[in-house]
Amino acid sequence: MKRPATRTFGILTSGGDCPGLNAAIRGVTKAAYWRYGMSIIGISHGYRGLIEGDARLLHPRDFDGILTRGGTILGTSREKPFKPDPGEKDSEAGSRKVEAIIENYHKLHLDCLVVLGGNGTHKTAYLLQQAGLNVIGLPKTIDNDIWGTDVTFGFHSAVDIATEAIDRLHSTAHAHNRVMVIEVMGHKAGWLALYAGIAGGGDIILIPEIPYDLAHIVHHLQTRQQRGKEFSIVVVAEGALSREESLMSKEERKKRRKKNRFPTKGYEVAHLIQEATGMETRVTVLGYLQRGGTPSPYDRLLATRFGTAAAELLYRGDYGKMVALRDGEVVAIPLGEVAEKLKTVPPDHPLIDTARAVGTCFGDGV
């Protein structure tokens, strides 16, 4: 075997945690260490650790036995080095952070930085590449909204968790003849609500990509009741928008929600349903439950595939790429193609049609 292009690389996890991070870390590090003989520097708490120089040499004992563990052994943060901190009027703080990252990258004698994260993480990775650093990305998020990959690790585990929650809510909704509103994550993309909503038999699914009208939701619930269905399940993505909200600017929506004083979109929808129909309505917000715990077998497999593919890129010196899954094959795509792009649910996605075919309502009157 020829000498690897990468001798030493740093690895960090950035952004929100999700199931599969440790499996991906394990995939990268085991392949890089045992197959290619590379040295690995673990960077704590995402980009913040690289700013502060919080890093250490990893040994096999560090990445053994972590395949099934949730969270991340490296810790994470939502540090965005190219953005000024809250209260900063200019970009000086951001510039200092970027300078610190570049300085510590060289102090640690890194040939490359491997980052595991979502959209913001990969945008930063691309900017660091533009600043002269070698970077490789691995896509993780339960939202499944990273452009360029068919699926991200963490997504399927979250679908499993949300679907199980919907299954459990069916029995209590049936027992009390209630409308149960369950809110799942998905601020700008409704993949999680769509997949879990269909798998869990949701009667109504509300996602950001399809603005809803309360009148259509009410009509669907009342029609179900007239047919003898005494309970209903409404699956709401946290970023779902009413038709009225979809025509507003971001700032206008913020003001409206602040005025309404509902803690989340799920509570707003539940309140409006009960007010309009008189049906007893309850809310469950899954929140961080969706991001925690043991990754599903699918996510362990996907994260391992992504990790070993990243090790291969390190070996070849094929930097500036994000590992992705396309049509069942693991590929590498340029970071520049990924940065600042979002993968949302197309309104004509086959799963939308599947859901409509079994009578699921999206609140749009179709």
Curated annotation (Swiss-Prot):
Ranges for region Disordered: 74-94
Swiss-Prot/TrEMBL catalytic activity: beta-D-fructose 6-phosphate + ATP = beta-D-fructose 1,6-bisphosphate + ADP + H(+)
Molecular function terms, GO-annotated: 6-phosphofructokinase activity; AMP binding; ATP binding; diphosphate-fructose-6-phosphate 1-phosphotransferase activity; fructose-6-phosphate binding; identical protein binding; metal ion binding; monosaccharide binding
Comp. bias intervals (Basic and acidic residues): 77-94
Binding residue positions for Mg(2+): N119
Record flagged with keyword Transmembrane: no
Pathway entry: Carbohydrate degradation; glycolysis; D-glyceraldehyde 3-phosphate and glycerone phosphate from D-glucose: step 3/4
Residues of the site described as Important for substrate specificity: G120
Cofactor annotation: Mg(2+)
Pfam families for the chain: PFK
Keyword Secreted: no
Keyword terms of this UniProt record: ATP-binding, Cytoplasm, Glycolysis, Kinase, Magnesium, Metal-binding, Nucleotide-binding, Transferase
GO CC annotation, single: 6-phosphofructokinase complex
Main localization, broad class: cytoplasm
GO biological process: canonical glycolysis; fructose 1,6-bisphosphate metabolic process; fructose 6-phosphate metabolic process
Cellular compartments annotated: Cytoplasm
EC numbers, comma separated: 2.7.1.11
Function: Catalyzes the phosphorylation of D-fructose 6-phosphate to fructose 1,6-bisphosphate by ATP, the first committing step of glycolysis.
Assembly with partners or alone: Homodimer or homotetramer.
The name this protein goes by in its record: ATP-dependent 6-phosphofructokinase
Source species: Spirochaeta thermophila (strain ATCC 49972 / DSM 6192 / RI 19.B1)
